[in-house]
């Protein structure tokens, strides 16, 4: 029987590529989503991957969502915290709601989901948790104090939880994508996009499948000695 995996935000963009990669690895994948029901149904019809709707920023919804997945597929072995939102704006223009929504989903969602699966993983002596960070959590980004703070927090969360899980066979890692050719990036005005690409040493945007391959590595059975790490996939744009 294949491992059971949950991918939050798993039916679109980078999340879709991750769901498909884990499916290709033989896992039973549950793709979480929070928005468009029609697109979620289309995703399931096209891929055979079931979708489950809940808001990862809601603690109780995460508990209930995981219970539903486990009832359908079995205990969760792999968790990929990919769901994220943006509410961009400079600090001067940002209101508290725009700050809190991003923190609750992007960082709080990692806590909520890990809390829902960690004890079960620990009791079974196996788990893979991958938290999707961002290049903007590593280097910051103008107009994204909320997003950068949340994504930066993911890296600290990852390192701390990795220490808690290590002796129970649970690895916890982060993956920090650079600028990836998704619908979100495609919406950036062309002049701005040109400036972004000019700062990427490889000279192009990344592909969602390239991020998915990195996640697949971190979720693999034989990746048990990799924990507390951040894998940066950004075309060389940010090195440290």
Feature locations, PLM:
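Residue(s) in the substrate-gating loop at a strand-loop-helix junction
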Residues: 134
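Alpha-helical segment proximal to the catalytic Tyr-Lys
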Residues: 119, 163-164, 224
